[in-house]
């Protein structure tokens, strides 16, 4: 966060400040003492006691010893310390020891030179790692910075015995960090922990997703109460890895420190998501006249962005980058015609003076591209820049009835277009809308969670200077959204830094108005010169101040309503959430020269004589034409405005205001120019011009005074200015009516000059002044400069107006012109004013002296009420601020004659504030008299402080308002109150240093800054690795505000003592820790500090140790957490309960409640990556209100879960979705899976899924109570998950067998095996084949049914894994599935049963077996269903009772929510509706992602998996969790991916929602539509069949050819559309109801999704969730998986372990670009990087689109596809060959059981045939020799793209 305000220290001072302590100082003064003296103002958090701590150890007892350096073979301890060798130091175990190298006397001087000379260069270089530096100690030369700290541990006895002379030894890594060498002499001393406690610690991490609760737990576990050092590697739970980057003690970087309870950890992500916005405003095309002459955009493309990308590369950061060009285009009425030929939606009419319609444009250049490919990013950016201005200038006329497709307006192709409009200036751009759009997707951050990136940072690059004109609604909405989401915004300005506080938002707050709105008020606001940018020379027409230039972004209010809802005064605010930087290419050009050791490069940061003359930044066109700046020789002395001091109020007692006492000098305008023209251009407000009736009134009188009189008058004035406060207070008491008084000229304290006279007077009166006068704040008003802040914007409230509401319109008869802009340099010593035109510093005060109303006393002097507001100049040089003083109370009752409304000019008066930094704070209860202001004054009295007293208990408030009343009245405004927590109102021209150092200045981010940052430099640390929202904050309202402005909602939570609870916390302490963790992961911060201690009356909260949960668990312990407008208080009460009180700000819920709908709709024109033109989008910009049900969430954490029907959606669980895509097996895979070489690829794919189910079953979470129940079971193995495999799509299965099935059958939750009574359990030694055959085929035997696989129907068969489970459950002497498989093979050898194709042994899997004919029992009917018949006597063994939270181990089976248990052979009766059956296509189980128990809590997720699967399609997995560690989930997924990959399955993360809905959550993305040039003919009628019959029924498939095309291009089915299922069936999944509008397919690479619309178009969407970043972790996942795989796959058929090989690259497995047609490169290994991964979807799409646009190829494809026999397959087919072309061929088993799989590129042989129906298994064997793709393999061969 930038340090706001005029903190204009020299660049030398800014850079070298941290090295002050390395300066050479006298021996009597330690370097640390010098540091404390110089940097005490930076220690924001230190108490006075802490500031006085001596950091040096000079007074401690030291011992000199020899330091050894050892390696890990000597000892694994980092530091070995022989306690016995230092008995004289009385060292105890647990003491903190300091190691300092023995320095020579000249070291300190040498360190000064080396540090000052190289500090800046090494600053960023060191951050990339100390290993890159030749001298890592270059920045840490002082004892404080370079000392090595450690905690004493006992020395191992064996080392002590072997090396008795060892005193202290460190490892090589520690020695390298601290610069120690072996056998060097060091000083050893014991230090106090308080002296070495770190204030902040920067911790960096990458390639992992960490929630803030994990960061909190990491600190508690690995850092709290320990010594840390720079570069230290942190490993938490063996998986989460981080590195200590920087350690700060009192604002200084050190090499080591103690992590105390009050140390603030700052986590920084080196793998974040960056959204770069480049504001393409009008100035982007302006030339840099003072620099290189390039346009400003060149600074972006050739300067800033390459520098940013290089720093990313140097730090090895791995970010994802999205770049968006945005602008606001203004259209003139002349170009559009009258009336406007546009619909009301197409353009927005902003209530600017000339009613200019605008439209916002966004051009997405790249989306989520890896930062390492920055050359590609810059190339794309250059291409888009060439056409950007042309594209946004073409306005296409829309009609109101423009059709919309997928929520986007699609206009006809031949709509008319005109060239109109021009980009607005940066000041009036759409920056807030852009930021709001970028942060909108964070509202859905819990869905489709990226598991390798943490944090989102927005960088806005603007050509402006950091000043923006916005509307109150957009500022409030954006601020609220950003406060809730905890996102960081960086603003990078290309223009030089202005002379005022930045970043600055100016807005007009809505006010309550009674009666009708008058358009006359609109004109009273006057001109707004700050709207005119100095570099926009093309526009010289005057502009009126807009009521709000951006409120038009929220259509819904008419223009008249806009006018009536705005006040006429500007408010100025600085947001907490914006960090500003200024890019100066010259600075970094010199730095590069220094880095390259250019001999001509300047010595860094040394004071050199300024070689070029001062160049003024004033860019007033009129002044330039007068030649004043070139030829004026007059001088002026301006006193310093002391830094950090406010401008005090002064009283002009005794100073006459009669015309005789004023200088009546008059200067003429240029004779050949019109007076009105000269004043009209940003010099005078419009009301002033309208009030001029006589041109002579504008002319200024010549001076009639002698120089001596002028000097005497100035001396008299100075006496009044610098008199003591005591006299002023008396004068204030005597003054009653308020009068405007004389003007002042003040300059920013960055460019200060002080005359000798002023210095003497200043010192004299500073010593004599009192420290009192708290009753009047500093008041300043905007100065007028050329492109800067406007002249005062409205009349002062009249005597009769209410002090709490500004009078928006003064009586026109009494109005006088506000101010003359004619200025004179004629001061002392130069005689009379020169007769030519004057333009510099003399100010006409005709508007400062107002005409008093009748009946009012006419004082001659008024009290000076000044407030300076800074220039909005876009340049970086000084400009003089003209301040109009408004009299608050007259000092004397002398009447002031009123001779004319035009008053003469007055010489410049200059005041200097006394040293009263915080003594003039205004009390809250101050009142304002009704006669405060004169009716006729047109100058605005600015009320409020220039800074905030940090001790006040009224919370953040507006210190700067522009209403006529007091500050208190403005604070009470509900609008200002609502905005105050996020945007701080200030006086931007003279912001006090005390205000700038206020800790609450940075809002929620205050703890992210170890020391106050500077505005003028680029915040590279934030730009390189954004900080995560700190865990703690000190922002808290006062007790009064908490009671009056917040709604309270209390409730209590207690742990669930139900023994059947799932992962339920058993104690209150564990529950409290989980509740705090849940809030931290949702963006809350723990509140500490004095504000919460004072508000709650609990002093202990000020020093709360947030890393000690034991102290938080005691009775009465209180924890406050805050987020935005919400505060939670957790109190541990008696009885083991936790009382939660939610405080919700009243204003946030009530402000604009009725208007929010009107303002929410935003309609920009957006062009995504592949779009050819801009399209209008309707986007809601509502801030996401806190609608989270914390009561439900806390009770869910506590174990009370029966009341939630869908907790994943109700409580916003984190959710991710994966698919297993079938891939062709490579030769290497075949070699490593020798035991399965007789299987075809389809069977191996099913084996892979079966392997995963075994892992899931083994690691499913079982509550302790259920574990005890299962331990009573003698069986040692669990059942595999019952997944039904089909060769048809789910919709076809449901439609064909609806009369027999109900997929939510409880029997499907577990194995269908029937348990025999205990007395009837069998034994292998006492069973005969005939009796076993009878039992198997009996009622309690294995399930027999007719099963179809592809085209072949197998009668009366059972499945291998069901029979394995039956054997395990019914044989007393079989204890594992391996034994059951072995016994099954024995039975098969004896002829009990056989494989249906006689080609497999018995296996535990989806293999079909039939009882041999000699043992077969005649059956009355065959159970011809794929699904089980219900039996009331069925007893099912327990698998995972936790699959349903309400299941109990006692039941023995899981209950279904939708269907009751039915009698046998009865049809299913739906429970919800008599006409609709409910079918559940997936199931959920609780899965333990921490089987090794590395975490201190249960780590459980909900695992959803398909229960019905077609091997040709994707297998779906969805994970959801609430409070689980994401890194453990990622490790688990890696292990699954490594396992699946060995079986030809690729695990890919895909979006949960369908592709066409991406724009709802990600506004910068949109599906790409591809249409067929030649419409396809009607498709053939599909073959519909059930278990026993075939029939051709139904209508033709209108998407038959579309699906065939997708099969051709290697797409597999992901999800079917909801309309594909029968209308009378209610289909649902365990994660929710499917709501896909269109069927969705996914490319085998996983990188591209496609949907088929109802119109027959294709919608393509790149899958950006695919990441090659996971590849690096595959090897670890393989090791992790190897430890946990089931025993029955360990070297069954070979001694070679197929899982011991190194797994190839994890998903995605994308082809190289030169071989985009094949799923895998010919070498069988993936050879693609993230750049190719990013481009792969575009290349696939390009080839597909070319095919769709080739009419000849389409016609040929239609004819070939139609000639084939009709297949029932809706999913992807395995090959382009017809199924009927495969002949029948029986081969010996020796031939079938081949060992070598054919190469992928040799599988194109074609064999003719015409048999319509054939055994699929036989065809698979044929494929083994003919190299044809298997019909079951799901397009397993690469397809020809032609």
From Swiss-Prot:
**Gene Ontology biological process terms in this record:** intracellular signal transduction; negative regulation of TORC1 signaling; positive regulation of autophagy
Q: One MF term in GO for this entry?
A: GTPase activator activity
Question: Per the record, which residues fall in region Disordered?
Answer: 1-49, 728-817, 887-976, 1422-1475, 1822-1842
Cited PROSITE patterns: DEP
Instruction: Establish whether keyword DNA-binding is in the entry.
Output: no
Major localisation: membrane
Q: Where is the DEP domain?
A: 1338-1413
Q: Which Pfam families match?
A: DEP, DEPDC5_CTD, IML1, IML1_N_fung
The record's section on InterPro entries has:
DEP_dom (IPR000591), DEPDC5_CTD (IPR045838), IML1 (IPR027244), IML1_N (IPR048255), WH-like_DNA-bd_sf (IPR036388), WH_DNA-bd_sf (IPR036390)
Q: Which GO terms describe its cellular component?
A: GATOR1 complex; vacuolar membrane
Q: Where in the cell is it found?
A: Vacuole membrane
- Polar residues bias spans: 16-31, 963-976
> Which controlled-vocabulary keywords does the entry list?
Membrane, Vacuole
The biased composition feature labelled Low complexity covers: 797-814
Biased-composition ranges, Basic residues, are 1-12, 728-738
The record gives the membrane topology as: Peripheral membrane protein
Q: Basic and acidic residues bias: where?
A: 36-49, 750-767
Family listed = Belongs to the IML1 family.
Record-given protein name: Vacuolar membrane-associated protein iml1
Protein species of origin: Neosartorya fischeri (strain ATCC 1020 / DSM 3700 / CBS 544.65 / FGSC A1164 / JCM 1740 / NRRL 181 / WB 181) (Aspergillus fischerianus)
Tell me the organism's taxonomic lineage. Eukaryota, Fungi, Dikarya, Ascomycota, Pezizomycotina
